[in-house]
């Protein structure tokens, strides 16, 4: 449980429990949607823990794909989501619902999308997307780029990048789990691969990977990940909305917490993060 003892953590939480009792009048179960991405899972489960333990409300987590998430929040079927990648990755989704949702602000900044290769591939062979055109490189990669799920903004941008660079490659659209399997298997035998990826992600703490250059900017620039809620959420759940608006995590801390979650569990990683950052948690919960 980190440097704090169980007693110490209890004291931190107890300090906010009086607020939790006062906030109980909001009362309703809060529905928070998320897609099965590592960063989204951690911040969503962190929010659930803080809401249930300190604000006196139950939280129902709704797991689905990205498009249904935006639709659900815009219709009011889902109260909030904590994984709006802006300004580029989720631009198409966000434009469709912008007038029907409330943006509560960024949860973390400095995120990025890109294509990765393992460090054991020499940079003289692959340092840029342009290098994928080399016949010998394409042969070693079998003309394939390992992708993630079909609804992801990264998938759309990767499809556009293949066209912009004139690559004779197939994008294997699947899931984050399939991408991670490719990365893991290749690293065991030092096999060649290129995969679509993003930061923050725990795998950068486990494997030696690097992004390759994108000179045409096809995959976008720096991103911020925002919490987005349905219209009227701030009025119906002012305390929860205030918490989500205050939550802000440095990206290096988030990646470390995500790695902890892979080594233990998301629940244990959430508990550890709360124990290790009592002052920040107290600030988030202050009204």
Predicted segments with their positions:
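Immediate post-signal peptide segment of exported/extracytoplasmic ligand-binding proteins
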Residues: 22-32, 134-142, 280-287
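Short, well-ordered beta-strand elements
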Residues: 26-39, 57-62, 142-146, 244
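Short helix-initiation/N-cap motifs at beta->coil->alpha
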Residues: 37-38, 60-72, 171-182
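An extracytoplasmic/periplasmic, membrane-proximal ligand-sensing/linker region
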Residues: 41, 154-155, 160-190, 222-224, ...
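Ligand-binding cleft/hinge of the Venus flytrap
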Residues: 47-56, 131, 136-171, 275
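A ligand-binding cleft/hinge motif common to bilobed small-molecule-binding domains
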Residues: 82-97, 185-210
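A conserved helix-loop-strand patch within extracytoplasmic ligand-binding domains
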Residues: 99-147
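A bilobed periplasmic-binding-protein/Venus flytrap-type ligand-binding module shared by bacterial periplasmic
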Residues: 113-123, 223-236
